[in-house]
């Protein structure tokens, strides 16, 4: 009888373990060189990032575009630049394209459907001229950072206004 209960406990615990969702952390940086992190031989210690790379999965062959907005759109949609239509950074709110097309479903929307909590920290740069482009309307429950391509480090302004 003890063996039967131990077997049941083992099966249930392995089933529960198999149903645990892994944590997903994506770090996307602009202009980060291969050797800028210490686990790739960089001179500046990056122990926390090194630990994440050691314990997690490093995907280091993601090629999309040499500028930020198309790269972010490719990562979030899983589409090539010519399929998602974001071909340049969103710099001018009066330009013909002011944000990533809202009809494109992106990674945080899928993750929310799968029961994940989603958050964005840092640079969005996929549209800010209309509320439909904002990260909190694209699947991120929380967004802490800035919407434009770059801000002042000390005053958090872009183009003379707070971002």
Please report, for each region that a protein language model flagged, where it lies by residue.
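Sec-dependent N-terminal signal peptides
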Residues: 3-12
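Formylglycine-dependent sulfatase
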Residues: 2, 16-163
